[in-house]
Amino acid sequence: MRAILPLLLAVSLPLAAAPLHSQFLPPDDQALRQEAPTAQQLLQVTDYSVVVGAQRQSDQQPIPITASLQMRLKGKPLSKGATIGQVLLTFDGEAGKSLKKPVYDDKTRTLSLNYPVSDYRVIMDLLRNETVYVQFLTYANGHVWADLHTGTVRTR
C-alpha cells in the first residue's frame, strides 16, 4: 500500500490542477486556456426569477421605449474560494451579434452575462428540468470564459 500511495498521488495531481467542472468546457481550438485559470467562480443554481420590463424616458425626444428581459439566478458557490452569490442574465441582441463580455463584480458578488434572446427558451428549459451550474473562469492572458451547464445526465 505504501508503494501505491505515491503513485496514486502523482497520477491525481494533474486532475487536481484542473478547475472543477472543466469537463464541460468546449475544445480549446485557439489555445486560449493553456494555463490554469487564475480564478474560478462556480455556482449551483437553486433559485431564479425573470423580469420583463419596459421603460420610457420622458426627457428624451422622440420618446424611446426600451424593453428588457433579465433573469436572476441565485445559488450556492461550489469552487474553492468562490464568493459568487448571484448571476444576472441579460437577453438582448440577436444570435451571431457581438455581446458584452462576462463580468464578475467582487463587491456585489454578481456575475453579469449577456445572451441573445434566442437562448432564453433553452435556458428556461434547463432551469425547469435539470440541475444547472454557472461557471466563470479568468486567465492570466486576459481570456474569460462563462457558461451555464448541467451535470452529466443519464438518458432515459
Give residue ranges: language-model regions:
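A structural detector for beta-sheet-dominated domains
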Residues: 46, 51-53, 70-74, 90-92, ...
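Short, solvent-exposed mixed-charge patches
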Residues: 154-156
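Bacterial N-terminal signal peptides
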Residues: 6-14
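Positively charged n-region of N-terminal signal peptides that target proteins for export
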Residues: 1-4
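Acidic, glycine-rich flexible loop segments
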Residues: 98-151
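Predominantly extracellular/secreted and cell-surface proteins with exposed
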Residues: 70-111
